[in-house]
């Protein structure tokens, strides 16, 4: 069966109607690497009235990320025996959610950049059957990016233009990790998250690109992304910028599927 026709462009912010969201159908997936001091806050902030299960995937941290997540009340903590990358962490979390019978997954950053109280923004279009994948955008009206460094602002503004050139979809924020989607999409043989080349930053743009390419209904909604003064980014700009671009190049040219 072909997926429903996607809705191009970004619609207006959905009304936050918690009553429409059944948390028993939702898992929040949180990839984390050396996030001690932050991961506990993330877990505690996830309202269980929107997501019944928080799945933290610890990508072989050298600190006490796993213990802190458990102490904060994470329903599932999965630890990789070796460091594999954020994409592998997301994949593990999604597969765990799917295996446990959840219908929807919301992905949140483990470094406390996202606002879990905004989960209704990414979940409501799914429960209303208006979208199959809902992408958060800090650049839509109603979104925000307080404290964003100038280099990150530049990257997150240029990338959507390249995504649009490659896919035809008018994305405004394809690098934002706050999103939610139907886990049934992973049953589509055209969406192959189990490829090793997606282990790091490639997986998220791959998923978005393939959702568009395969005709799923993709929608953007405004969200907040906060940049904290403490800590340093784990991104290495030139290398990881290529990792974000690689799925667009490989899929557009047919090098990968």
Please report, for each region that a protein language model flagged, where it lies by residue:
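Hydrophobic helical membrane-anchoring modules
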Residues: 1-23, 168, 192-257
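Short, well-formed alpha-helical segments that are part of the catalytic scaffolds
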Residues: 11-17, 34-48
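Hydrophobic targeting segments
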Residues: 24-30, 39, 45-46, 53-57
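Conserved sequence signature across two-component system core domains
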Residues: 32, 57-59, 80
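Donor nucleotide-sugar binding loop of glycosyltransferases
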Residues: 35-38, 61, 115
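A conserved acidic beta->alpha catalytic loop
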Residues: 58-66
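Acceptor/aglycone-binding surface of glycosyltransferases and processive sugar-polymer synthases
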Residues: 76, 80-82, 86-99, 104, ...
């Amino acid at each position: 069966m072909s997926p429903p026709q996607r809705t191009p462009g970004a619609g207006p912010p959905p009304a936050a109607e918690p009553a429409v969201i059944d948390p028993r159908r939702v898992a929040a997936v949180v990839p984390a690497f050396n996030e001690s001091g932050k991961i506990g806050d993330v877990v505690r902030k996830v309202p269980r009235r929107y997501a019944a299960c928080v799945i933290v995937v610890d990508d072989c941290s050298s600190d006490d990320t796993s213990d802190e997540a458990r102490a904060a009340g994470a329903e599932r903590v999965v630890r990789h025996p070796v460091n594999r990358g954020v994409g592998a962490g997301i994949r593990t979390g999604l597969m765990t959610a799917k295996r446990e019978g959840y219908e929807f997954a919301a992905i949140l950053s483990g470094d406390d950049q996202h606002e879990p109280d905004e989960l209704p923004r990414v979940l409501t279009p799914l429960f209303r059957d208006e979208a199959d994948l809902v992408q958060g955008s800090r650049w839509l009206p109603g979104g925000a990016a307080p404290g964003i460094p100038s280099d990150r602002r530049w990257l997150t503004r240029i990338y959507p233009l390249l995504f649009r050139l490659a896919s035809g979809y008018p994305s405004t924020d394809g690098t934002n990790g706050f999103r939610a989607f139907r886990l049934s999409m992973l049953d589509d043989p055209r969406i192959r998250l189990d490829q090793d080349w997606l282990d790091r930053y490639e997986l998220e743009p791959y998923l978005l690109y393939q959702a568009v390419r395969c005709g799923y209904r993709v929608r953007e909604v405004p969200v907040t992304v906060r940049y904290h003064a403490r800590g340093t980014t784990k991104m290495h700009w030139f290398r990881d910028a290529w990792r974000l671009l690689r799925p667009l190049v490989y899929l557009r040219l047919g090098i990968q599927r």
